[in-house]
Amino acid sequence: MVIIMEKPWVEKYRPKTLDDIVGQDEIVKRLKKYVEKKSMPHLLFSGPPGVGKCLTGDTKVIVNGEIREIGEVIEEISNGKFGVTLTNNLKVLGIDEDGKIREFDVQYVYKDKTNTLIKIKTKMGRELKVTTYHPLLINHKNGEIKWEKAENLKVGDKLATPRYILFNESDYNEELAEWLGYFIGDGHADKESNKITFTNGDEKLRKRFAELTEKLFKDAKIKERIHKDRTPDIYVNSKEAVEFIDKLGLRGKKADKVRIPKEIMRSDALRAFLRAYFDCDGGIEKHSIVLSTASKEMAEDLVYALLRFGIIAKLREKVNKNNNKVYYHIVISNSSNLRTFLDNIGFSQERKLKKLLEIIKDENPNLDVITIDKEKIRYIRDRLKVKLTRDIEKDNWSYNKCRKITQELLKEIYYRLEELKEIEKALEENILIDWDEVAERRKEIAEKTGIRSDRILEYIRGKRKPSLKNYIKIANTLGKNIEKIIDAMRIFAKKYSSYAEIGKMLNMWNSSIKIYLESNTQEIEKLEEIRKTELKLVKEILNDEKLIDSIGYVLFLASNEIYWDEIVEIEQLNGEFTIYDLHVPRYHNFIGGNLPTILHNTTAALCLARDLFGENWRDNFLELNASVSKDTPILVKIDGKVKRTTFEELDKIYFETNDENEMYKKVDNLEVLTVDENFRVRWRKVSTIIRHKVDKILRIKFEGGYIELTGNHSIMMLDENGLVAKKASDIKVGDCFLSFVANIEGEKDRLDLKEFEPKDITSRVKIINDFDIDEDTAWMLGLYVAEGAVGFKGKTSGQVIYTLGSHEHDLINKLNDIVDKKGFSKYENFTGSGFDRKRLSAKQIRILNTQLARFVEENFYDGNGRRARNKRIPDIIFELKENLRVEFLKGLADGDSSGNWREVVRISSKSDNLLIDTVWLARISGIESSIFENEARLIWKGGMKWKKSNLLPAEPIIKMIKKLENKINGNWRYILRHQLYEGKKRVSKDKIKQILEMVNVEKLSDKEKEVYDLLKKLSKTELYALVVKEIEIIDYNDFVYDVSVPNNEMFFAGNVPILLHNSDERGIDVIRTKVKDFARTKPIGDVPFKIIFLDESDALTADAQNALRRTMEKYSDVCRFILSCLTGDAKITLPDEREIKIEDFIKMFEERKLKHVLNRNGEDLVLAGVKFNSKIVNHKVYRLVLESGREIEATGDHKFLTRDGWKEVYELKEDDEVLVYPALEGVGFEVDERRIIGLNEFYEFLTNYEIKLGYKPLGKAKSYKELITRDKEKILSRVLELSDKYSKSEIRRKIEEEFGIKISLTTIKNLINGKIDGFALKYVRKIKELGWDEITYDDEKAGIFARLLGFIIGDGHLSKSKEGRILITATINELEGIKKDLEKLGIKASNIIEKDIEHKLDGREIKGKTSFIYINNKAFYLLLNFWGVEIGNKTINGYNIPKWIKYGNKFVKREFLRGLFGADGTKPYIKKYNINGIKLGIRVENISKDKTLEFFEEVKKMLEEFEVESYIKVSKIDNKNLTELIVKANNKNYLKYLSRISYAYEKDNFARLVGEYLRIKEAYKDIILKEIAENALKEADGEKSLRELARKYNVPVDFIINQLKGKDIGLPRNFMTFEEFLKEKVVDGKYVSERIIKKECIGYRDVYDITCHKDPSFIANGFVSHNCNYPSKIIPPIQSRCAVFRFSPLKKEDIAKKLKEIAEKEGLNLTESGLEAIIYVSEGDMRKAINVLQTAAALSDVIDDEIVYKVSSRARPEEVKKMMELALDGKFMEARDLLYKLMVEWGMSGEDILNQMFREINSLDIDERKKVELADAIGETDFRIVEGANERIQLSALLAKMALMGR
């Protein structure tokens, strides 16, 4: 069975982001009212995951099988209350994951208010009024199916509606229903009397009505009346009938008020009712059935009723011109609908029936259609190579056609997937055989295969390679079906891949792959490589999420029951509206509307407060937490005592069992096992235990155990960088978990049994209060677990009873010896065995000691009885010394196991707890152990050839080793051959050690050293790998748990210990200090709520954020998340200076196509992106316009860089200045996946180059060595064909005969092994190695190549040397920039060389210096030549623009031009206001004049693409042609050139500043002066003088005069010069400080922001913009709740003020010395300060410095400083004594002392250099201590070093 859909489609396409699901403005408005009334204080801002998506009260919905208005239903349930009301007896209809109609339970209902609605009308007559953010399931015009907010809908979109609906059917009299149909259609009941009339012109219908009336109503008097001037009728007088009509509310009812009675709507009698009603009021018009009614309710009921039979009807309104009344027409059209009506309802009237049959024709394909997402269908076609019909090209498919096509397609898909599964299964097995086994069975194999024995020996020794046929024969004999694998490989290559694809991955030629797969090849290793590659490709297909998604789409199309109704009208309504919604868990939709429509339910207010939800308040939000199940085993220390327990038992110890709302419990006496930095198992303290409830969990089974946990609890795994956390939901079968086998230290060797001492002690009673445990007694206690029992006579006289088989002499003797040695009284007897009580086959040894018996009873059982199933290993045993724990296990194994000690021991027990205890005890005692059903297995570490505990995951280890590959002296691949070539998933630590011994450590780089150190740690680790076997989801519905392990985040748990990631440490701590404690206190003043500021929310983990969310829901009154962002049209600059709108960047960032931007640091990594509407955070958007004309729109709290630092838009005013970076513009980022290098064309070029070098083709070459590469490949192909049939010498002869060349035997041997050389092949491989063949036009490297190419054409030279040298002459600054570009491409250049030069120019002698670099890179050299760069003198050979540039995108063209002008272009010249001189000049010989002109024409065309005008000028100088391309001299043209192209390298920065000056100058003329001129002309007629106007507008008087004369606006004389611009405006040489000339508020907008890694900034529209503080890393539920303000660190006085306030309230005497001490130890952290104060207060009411330093385990700073000064003065012994005092008396750790020493460095009276040395020494010591070195020794060594250092 192939599982296609991972989750419901309806769920998949529901809104997933906060922006999609929240309408915060209205909800917040209402919640504020609640807070003002103080009735629901916890509702404000601590809202649930989503709010809002609602409907108006008149929306119809089917609830409990009845059509009702949603408002009426919810008002009944909520009693008019706004907000959330729980319900458990409501059912509605909705669609499931396959688009099928089902009935669902409603969990709660919701009522609210809003000011805005969207009214939607559809083609079929549907009319919906929903909130703007209500999602509706839509089929877009592009074929996409998704939930879309109402405000985003467009006319032409298709709305999902059901094809049929379900009701809970009830019994109803069919004849009575028919009678009602007639009555409602053409009947009338008099209001005052018992008269009923039925008026109809059809005699048969009248007769039928009369028959039914007579039958149904016994008192009926019936009379038919025929009238002359009106329609005949049936007159009925019946009290019973009228009373029946009256009950239904139909008596005297007008035609516009009638409805279908609800009892009939839900019964099977509905068809009889409809037939009768359509007989009366229905008819045939054109090609449709039409029924007209004056009742809108009846019309809508009819549409619902018809859907019960799958009949889709249209509702149409018409105004009757005679009476001006609105009538509602039900229209049934389309043949399939008409046929369904005929089959299920039909007409009784023959005339109508006949007409109906006449209009049923072939289906109209243009009706009832769905728009197809052709991209998904095509993706399936391309990925699975499925053949499709031509229908795929059509945009719209009819419903029936769609189902037919997709069902056929699914059959083909399933077949292909099954075939791929079979191929995968076949390819999982490697094709390599064990030649050692072949050697052992050589004779047998020779007999069975017919291959000579000596030939097989040659194969074994590697002297000859077997052909594939012979290899298969040998493999078959060994029981290995390789033929099946090869067949699978061939099928996959031909059917699902290609030789080209496989060849590309293996860096082989297509022809080689074909030869290996299709011929009788000898290259079995190559086949194995192909197998592994194909297996990887198969797995990629089967795990392709896009493919799975596309198949899910097809499955949805094939099985859905949706009719897509086109939207024809959308209107926004404004006013006050009450809105309603229902919550349907999991599927989140229901059917409702005036005509049935699929509606999304809200996820609003899931858990606004516990009092609203009762016991279910957590159900919908706590499932996000990561936790393990209650019965998960764990080994802990409580108050220093070891205990093997479960989380459920910890719950009983730490939580109040009667308060389920208590979710966190801070603990200070709990420790768990975890791992340290060296991967060693250690005890670590727990800070908090967390619990919450969930419905479902995962059970993951692995080798020897299982673990139960929530889907997003993280499990620690190993990757190439070390330990990483991976969510349980992402774990796959075959992954490796980490467990441990370690020797955990134990100290106990004595038991204190005093508490078990008998009360009445006599001389005969042996008292053993201190019970020494040696190896014998440990063994005895272990044996008790296996074979012991305890018995008492009364409350005294206890016995410890051992029952052993009478044949177990060794055990009996050993036990007797131990009992005697310990001096216990004993009694022996024989007894019956458990199998035969009569047969005395067992011996009992009874130790007669009540004290020991009481101890055993209390500690060896679980408290639920003393049977075998209740046995446990006592907690005290876990604390014993290691040798004693091992002896205990031996005793247990000797009594109750099979197998041999020191090998595999199987211990059986009925007690699950005992087995788990055994596994944990073994693992902390250095013994590998596993758990199975009723059995624990121990694998002792001695004497075993294999142990799982010595194994680690192979994949990450191999990745690490590959990073060291070049520094390994030896064949490490042979050592790991089973992992590399046979797919073994694990590798032993011994092999890692073996490889590490081969590493040349001295030659390792810093990064390689890190990898080496990591491998070294892993080779010695106590961790090892266990493979995941099975994963399942199980029902749970109970508490799950987690623990927080500060500064470690890991712990071991499980029935077999697995390393888990703890999830909540950071969150718990932050919540307690930042939110929880703050929220607990009452608000001050009249406002009944407070604001919570979260100053570190962007650093919280996801789990911490969830914890924050829970606490907010429980305590907080107000929490809004404040973000600062830009509007979507802001263009941000990428590192290569392409532009992209920020909204487009975020889309590409999410798709991982872009991840870097340009900011103050240069290139920076983007960590996160966010989008939302600024109304959500209550920040309006402002537009800023600068004096250069640059504009940007940003929220009021967004920051921009100014000379004075970052400033918010709110702070900025007109005439303030912001900094601008003149980034290039005009080249947008566009996806362009064309490759810049065509390998086929390059190979062709290399072939021609080979011929120039003297290589020859077949026919001209005399020997193989002379051949061009292409013909060598032909020889290779032929050699491989012959290799299976002939010897090497025979092959040589045939090749020489066939091709007429000489070839050596060595060459033949190499060719048989697939080895081929050749000039062309060599450089194609080099291009691939460098990755240049993968570079696409949208890649930054394409721009680098283009830029270098332009510069080299200008100032570069390709020499004629054999090595392929490239010379580039330029300034030193330019060369440094060029070298950086070359490095990015993997090209190494020489150092920069400077030389003195002398030459003549125009008759003048010129002396100076020149600088250049050379590049010896033949691949780059050949590539440049391939692109058209001439070798030798360009002035003779001419210039070319490479085709890939000429036909490339604007990006590569711009970079080419920048390089070209950077080399040969003139730098812009500017003086005062004017600029000129941008041109490109080249001197060439006459021979290349025309070619150069062509080149310049091409450059001119390129410039035109950037709207830059230029012209070409040719002149003669010294018999050479100076060809110039001159940029036309006007400011606007220059500005276009400088802002869109500029120069590469050194000239670039100056050119940008010139460009920005021009921009300001032109904007001043076009914007500012224009406005001044207009205002001046208006005011010139007034009283003001011309001089006053000039002063007012800061312009010369003649400017005003010129405007009055009507002259063109010119630049006034007082405008700043360029020199003034550089002095006054330029900041840091690259930024321009520009004045804001306009600031305006433009309201709320959709806004965007990004977060960068190194620097909180990015360039947008030239502005230096501040990014947000990681808002997108905050989970949506937090974003929907919080207002985050970033705070700077607290000042000392602020902390002091707060501490004094607290001390006063708590009645404490806080001394000045105590206050200073708290400030010192808290390091500016208020949380720490308050905690220290509270801890100190527990010891004394007087808080002085002594008590502060005591409770915080800190030394006085003066003592630390004194110790450091003593050391620096050379008084080492005194300094060391003080150090020991700090460690012993103050209890300080080495890390604490180092931290304080580091803080004191600045206060020491030593020079700066000594301070640097001291900081370095402290850092080195800290590292050594962290790595596990002895603290005292390291700190003493540090003091010694300081003594030597001196002052």
Swiss-Prot record:
Post-translational modification: This protein undergoes a protein self splicing that involves a post-translational excision of the intervening region (intein) followed by peptide ligation.
GO molecular function, one term: ATP binding
InterPro entries noted in UniProt: Cro/C1-type_HTH (IPR001387), DNA_pol3_clamp-load_cplx_C (IPR008921), DNA_Rep/Repair_Clamp_Loader (IPR050238), Hint_dom_C (IPR003586), Hint_dom_N (IPR003587), Hint_dom_sf (IPR036844), Homing_endonucl (IPR027434), INTEIN (IPR006142)
Organism: Methanocaldococcus jannaschii (strain ATCC 43067 / DSM 2661 / JAL-1 / JCM 10045 / NBRC 100440)
Subunit organization: Heteromultimer composed of small subunits (RfcS) and large subunits (RfcL).
GO cellular component, as recorded: DNA replication factor C complex
Keywords noted in UniProt: ATP-binding, Autocatalytic cleavage, DNA replication, Nucleotide-binding, Protein splicing, Repeat
Alphabetized Pfam families for the sequence: HTH_3 (PF01381), Intein_splicing (PF14890), LAGLIDADG_3 (PF14528), RCF1-5-like_lid (PF21960), Rep_fac_C (PF08542)
Gene (UniProt): rfcS
Function noted in UniProt: Part of the RFC clamp loader complex which loads the PCNA sliding clamp onto DNA.
Biological process per Gene Ontology, one example term: intein-mediated protein splicing
Domain DOD-type homing endonuclease: 179-311, 780-927, 1348-1508
Name of the featured protein: Replication factor C small subunit
Similarity comment: family membership: Belongs to the activator 1 small subunits family. RfcS subfamily.
Other notes: The intein interrupts the potential ATP-binding site.
Entry keyword annotation includes ATP-binding: yes
